């Protein structure tokens, strides 16, 4: 009722309140979804069904490692999650970075690559991203991620420090741009120029999100003033944490367009309207004007005892 009143104050008129709320919905035989980032997690399952993304069990990976087989294990999660728990021998490489940095992380095309997360979604999305980009290595998702590893009776590494990601040289950057262009053409993803983007951002009738999908370090070195920092892998995994307005425009930016394109590919498949900015974010000036990724600079602090009396 409070939300309905607030929406009415904002000028909305076609409003209704669900009689009985969620309990009544469930009592009527409809489904209630539980958990976090549910749309993204459901999407991961659909991707596996659609593409038949290959995977392997924890026992199989463990056997490969014990037999001394050459295999690269890449953890597609955030730095914080990697520190909390990781597969022994695994290397930190967030999902959006996989296609961008894989040539620097594997010795040759004959080396199998296993992508893991804590459960399923990012393992599947990360592996399928590499497959969709056409890498010739054997690409596999680790079934059930670190959870599956632990349930199989194997120990995890806790407190691991994420390895610094390798930086591409000029030749690798050029190759990345070519790969991005090929993906844009193949998937018919839309691009947008800076002038049009500014028009969209000034439009008070429709929300536009500009998301910088690079690493935090790159973002801090320089970014477009209006850009939110939203690492591409996490933006796909937890879209609802960045995009609050339905049918909003989503514009993604990076340096070579590869990370933006792979992220856009999945966001569009999820039903979002998404564009890739055709400008190089690495050439943007360092600015303190945009602190959108740090809400503490935008909102006043509120002590717990003050919150409790409101």
For the regions a language model picked out, list residue spans one by one.
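Rhodanese-like catalytic fold shared by cysteine-dependent sulfurtransferases
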Residues: 1-72, 76-209, 213-310
């Amino acid at each position: 009722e409070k939300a309905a009143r607030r929406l009415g104050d904002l000028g909305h008129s076609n409003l209704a309140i669900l009689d009985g709320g969620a309990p009544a919905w469930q009592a009527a035989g409809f489904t209630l979804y539980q958990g976090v980032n549910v749309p993204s997690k459901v999407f991961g399952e659909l991707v596996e069904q659609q593409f038949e993304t290959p995977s392997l069990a924890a026992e199989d990976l463990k056997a490969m490692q014990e037999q001394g087989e050459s295999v690269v294990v890449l953890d597609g999660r955030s730095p914080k999650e990697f520190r909390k728990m990781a597969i022994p021998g695994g290397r930190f490489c967030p999902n959006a970075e996989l296609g961008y940095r894989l040539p620097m992380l594997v010795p040759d095309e004959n080396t199998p690559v296993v992508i893991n997360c804590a459960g399923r979604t990012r393992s599947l999305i990360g592996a399928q991203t590499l497959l969709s980009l056409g890498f010739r290595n054997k690409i596999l998702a680790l079934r059930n991620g670190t959870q599956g590893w632990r349930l199989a009776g194997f120990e995890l590494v806790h407190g691991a420090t994420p390895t610094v990601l390798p930086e591409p040289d000029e030749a690798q950057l050029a190759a990345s741009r070519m790969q991005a262009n090929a993906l844009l053409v193949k998937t018919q993803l839309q691009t947008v120029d800076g002038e049009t983007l500014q028009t969209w951002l000034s439009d008070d009738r429709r929300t536009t999100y500009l998301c910088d999908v690079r690493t935090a370090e790159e973002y801090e070195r320089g970014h477009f003033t209006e850009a939110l920092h939203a690492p591409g892998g996490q933006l796909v995994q937890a879209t609802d944490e960045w995009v609050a307005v339905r049918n909003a425009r989503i514009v993604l930016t990076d340096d070579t367009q590869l990370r933006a394109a792979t992220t856009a590919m999945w966001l569009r498949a999820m039903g979002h309207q998404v564009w890739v900015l055709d400008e190089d974010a690495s050439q943007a000036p360092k600015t303190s004007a945009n602190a959108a990724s740090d809400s503490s600079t935008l909102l006043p602090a509120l002590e717990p005892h003050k919150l409790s009396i409101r």
